[in-house]
């Protein structure tokens, strides 16, 4: 019998196993395997759409933008002219989302949406294909964008022109 090697330290044994696993992974994940090749070309990346749908879900609470303001006051219109108003943000999200439209299931036409303040979040729209989280989120997104665009257009069409706003704004608010 040859000289006996003392049993290796359990910690160093696990470290060497980790190194072997890492080496194996590095070797197997070389140029031969590319994760982008494994993605199904028919199914596009829906992460941007899901992210935008989540942003819109958060913004759907924006009925408070309309409730506390009197529609006849200058402040109501000034608030809508502010680019940080959720309506503008929703429209911006809609523009960014337009490049994803090819990857979204086709939906039935969107009916006239009632004001969010009176009914809360609009109901989900029935998709033409089997229900999925994506199609429900996108239906809600479509409705929110349609409502936001319509509300913004209607309000801005009644808004006081910029030239008259300084006369209406109290001195405390003017810069």
Swiss-Prot record:
Keyword annotations: Acetylation, Nucleus, Ubl conjugation pathway
Bias kind Acidic residues: ranges: 12-21, 29-41
UniProt keyword Cytoplasm present: no
Pathway of action: Protein modification; protein ubiquitination
Record GO cellular component, one term: Cul4-RING E3 ubiquitin ligase complex
An example Gene Ontology biological process: protein ubiquitination
Stretch list, region Disordered: 1-42
Top-level taxon of origin: Eukaryota
Modification N6-acetyllysine, positions: 61
Annotated localization: Nucleus
InterPro entries per record: DCAF16
Subunit structure: Interacts with DDB1 and CUL4A.
Role summary: Functions as a substrate recognition component for CUL4-DDB1 E3 ubiquitin-protein ligase complex, which mediates ubiquitination and proteasome-dependent degradation of nuclear proteins.
Protein name as annotated: DDB1- and CUL4-associated factor 16
Taxonomic source organism: Bos taurus (Bovine)
